Amino acid sequence: MSTEMIVVPASHADVGDIVSLVNSAYRGEGAGWTNEVGLLAGPRTDPATLAEVLAAEKGTMLLMREKDGAQLAGCVALEPAGEAATWHLAMLTVDPRRQAEGLGRALLSKAEDYVRRQGAARVQMTVISLRHSLIAWYERRGYRRTGASEPFPYGDDRVGVPLRDDLHFVVLEKPCRWGRRDGPARLRAKSLQIE
């Protein structure tokens, strides 16, 4: 029996569920294979910050849910960046109990499809430089380090409490193009169907 998943735009009614999902995946006890435990403490996001994301004139947050709409399995935020035809991807999250099912890969593919349809030439993201396994995961999906880095926003409570003084972000980028390798994901996960 398979669990069908759908990807839909988030609404303000979803804020509470998204906050719980993101905080459990990034900082929760028993968090999944990749998290920020040991790097940052406190919540990863809060209702006010997510409400701002959803109220933004441009961009979107996509949610991955079971088809019946009951269970939120993942989310990702997307917004146009300052450069023409560049979109920023952030907060890619999968419920820690559902990781290793191919959901993150599928949601990333849907996010890339979305920005392609918006005319994006590239997708960029920032990742904490010490999250080596996460950076490697993105690199296996075609993202490359640009060589640029950005300072960590020490003192900004919206991102949590830093536990180290050597945090900074690396910038990853992937060109947006349709093709056999970069087109919509053909998932091999046993129990996953994406509409």
Give the label of every model feature segment:
Residues 82, 104, 165:
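Short, conserved glycine- and acidic-residue-centered signature motifs
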